[in-house]
From Swiss-Prot:
It comes from Kocuria rhizophila (strain ATCC 9341 / DSM 348 / NBRC 103217 / DC2201). This reaction introduces a second double bond into the aromatic ring system. Belongs to the chorismate synthase family. PROSITE patterns: CHORISMATE_SYNTHASE_1 (PS00787), CHORISMATE_SYNTHASE_2 (PS00788), CHORISMATE_SYNTHASE_3 (PS00789). This is Chorismate synthase. The keyword Lyase applies. The keyword Amino-acid biosynthesis applies. Disulfide bonds: none annotated. The lineage of its organism: Bacteria, Bacillati, Actinomycetota, Actinomycetes, Micrococcales. One of its GO terms (biological process) is amino acid biosynthetic process. Pathway: Metabolic intermediate biosynthesis; chorismate biosynthesis; chorismate from D-erythrose 4-phosphate and phosphoenolpyruvate: step 7/7. FMN binds at R135, A136, S137, Q256, A257, G300, K315, P316, I317, A318, T319, R341.
Length: 416
C-alpha cells in the first residue's frame, strides 16, 4: 500500500513530504526532484514569487546512492525566504515586542472570497486568516510534485509514462481532435509558455493572459494528463472506493482551485446517444482492439490498457489583483480583500501538479495489484499477471485500423 503525507506552511521553514510503501530499487535522486519542481514553476502568467522561489531539496531518508531502500522516503523542500519570516512563523513563542510593528505579522482580518480564509477561521477558531492561508496555500503542492517523482519512477519501471498539457485557458481551447502529446514531447511542452501542444492555440492563450493582466483579472483553464503503457486491471469494480476513476477524481479534486474532473470524453459523453458513447471491440492481429477510446482508458473502475486520459478544470485564482468585496471580521465593516502576492494564470503549473497526483494514484493501484518488496519482484509479478491472461482476452492498446473498422461495419450489417 502506498501512503503519502505532507506537512509545512507556505512561509514556514520548509515543506516535508513522506511516502511509504515504496519498493526497494526505485531510481531516485535529488536532481530528479529538483527538475520536477522547476517544471512546477513554469508558465506564462506566474507571479513574482516564481522569480525568486528556489526549491532547495533534501532527501532525508529511504534512499541510498540513488536507489530506494524499501522504507519510507522523506523529502524536504526548504523555504529560501525563511529568514524574513522566522519570527512571524516561529514554531516556538516569540516576544510580542519583537513582532510589534512587523507588517508580515499584521492580522489578516479581511478574508478573500474564493479562498479557505473565512470558513477556515470559523472551523478552527482563528480570529485572522494567516494560519489558514499558510496551510491552504498552493505552495503545498510543491511537496506533492516531489512525491509524484517517486511514484513516476515506480511507474517507469513498469513501462508506464505520463505527460500533462494545457488544453484550455479561459475560453481559449485546443481544437477538438487535435493531436495528443506523448512522453517524448515533454521537453517541447515545457518550453511552451502555457505548456500547450498546439502552437496557434498557445499564442491565443498568451494574448488572453496579457489581457487579463492588464484588466487586473485572473484566469483559469483545463489541463489533461495522459498515461501510456498502462496494464489492464488496475482498480476494481467491487467497491466504489476501489474504482480507479473514483480515486483519480478525488486526487485531482484535492488540488487547490480544481473544480471539476472528467475521464476520457467525460461530460461530452452525456450529450451522445448510447451507440456513439462507448468503445466497441473487435479482434484483429491476434488480440482484441477497441475501436475508440471515449472511456479514456477506464471501464468499470478498472484500467483497460488503453491510453488513460483525465482532465481537471481549474478556476481563476481567487486572489484577484483589484481585490474583491469582503467584510473586515475585526470591525464588521465592508472592505476589500487582502491581496497576497499571486499569479494571473497558474494553469501550466496545475498540469504538473495533476501529473504528480495521477502518478501517485496509479503507482498505488499498481502496487496493490502486483505487489512486491523490490522493483524486480514488482515487474516479475506484473509479467506473470499479463502472461496469465488467456489469449482470447488479451487486448491491444492500439486502436483498430480503418480496414478493421470497415469489417466491423459488415459484421454490424450481418447482426442486424
Amino acid at each position: 500500500m502506498l501512503r503519502w503525507l505532507t506537512a509545512g506552511e507556505s512561509h514556514g521553514e520548509a515543506l516535508v513530504g513522506i511516502v511509504e510503501g515504496v519498493p526497494a530499487g526505485v531510481e531516485l535522486t535529488t536532481g530528479m526532484v529538483q527538475d520536477a519542481l522547476a517544471r512546477r514553476r513554469l508558465g506564462y502568467g506566474r507571479g513574482a514569487r516564481m522569480k525568486f522561489e528556489q526549491d532547495r531539496v533534501r532527501i532525508l531518508g529511504g534512499v541510498r546512492h540513488g536507489l530506494t531502500q524499501g522504507g519510507p522516503v522523506a523529502i524536504e523542500i526548504a523555504n529560501t525566504e525563511w529568514p524574513k519570516w522566522q519570527d512571524v512563523m516561529s514554531s516556538d513563542p516569540v516576544d510580542p515586542q519583537v513582532l510589534e510593528g512587523r507588517a508580515r505579522n499584521a492580522p489578516l482580518t479581511r478574508p478573500r472570497p474564493g479562498h479557505a480564509d473565512l470558513t477556515g477561521m470559523q472551523k478552527y477558531g482563528f480570529d485572522e486568516a494567516r494560519p489558514v492561508l499558510e496551510r491552504a496555500s498552493a505552495r503545498e503542492t510543491a511537496t506533492r510534485v516531489a512525491l509524484g517523482v517517486v511514484a513516476s519512477q515506480i511507474l517507469a519501471a513498469l513501462g508506464v509514462r505520463l505527460v500533462s498539457h494545457t488544453t484550455a485557458v479561459a475560453e481559449v481551447a485546443v481544437p477538438e481532435g487535435a493531436p495528443l502529446p506523448g512522453p517524448q514531447d515533454v521537453p517541447a511542452l515545457d518550453a511552451d509558455p502555457l505548456r500547450c501542444f498546439d502552437a496557434e492555440t498557445s499564442a491565443a492563450m498568451v494574448a488572453a493572459v496579457d489581457a487579463a493582466h492588464k484588466a487586473g483579472e485572473t484566469l483559469g483553464g483545463v489541463v489533461e494528463v495522459l498515461a501510456e503503457g498502462m496494464p489492464p486491471g488496475l482498480g476494481s469494480y467491487v467497491h466504489w472506493d476501489r474504482r480507479l476513476d473514483s480515486r483519480l477524481a478525488g486526487a485531482l479534486m484535492g488540488i487547490q482551485a480544481i473544480k471539476g474532473v472528467e475521464v476520457g470524453d467525460g461530460f461530452r459523453t452525456a450529450q451522445r446517444p448510447g451507440s456513439l458513447a462507448h468503445d466497441e471491440t473487435l479482434r484483429a492481429d491476434g488480440s482484441v482492439h477497441r475501436v475508440s477510446n471515449r472511456a479514456g482508458g477506464i471501464e468499470g473502475g478498472m484500467s483497460t490498457g488503453d491510453l488513460l486520459r483525465v482532465r481537471a478544470a481549474m478556476k481563476p485564482i481567487a486572489t484577484v489583483p483589484r481585490s474583491l468585496h469582503t467584510v473586515d471580521v475585526a470591525t464588521g465593516e465592508p472592505a476589500r480583500a487582502h491581496h497576497q502576492r499571486s499569479d494571473v494564470c497558474a494553469v501550466p503549473a496545475a498540469g504538473v501538479v495533476a501529473e504528480a497526483m495521477v502518478a501517485l494514484v496509479l503507482a498505488e493501484a499498481a502496487l496493490e495489484k502486483f505487489g512486491g518488496d523490490s522493483v524486480a519482484e514488482l515487474v516479475r509479478n506484473r509479467d506473470s499477471y499479463l502472461a496469465g491472461i488467456p489469449e482470447s482476452l488479451r487486448t491491444s492498446p492500439e486502436l483498430a485500423d480503418p480496414a478493421a473498422l470497415a469489417a466491423l461495419d459488415e459484421v454490424r450489417g450481418d447482426l442486424s
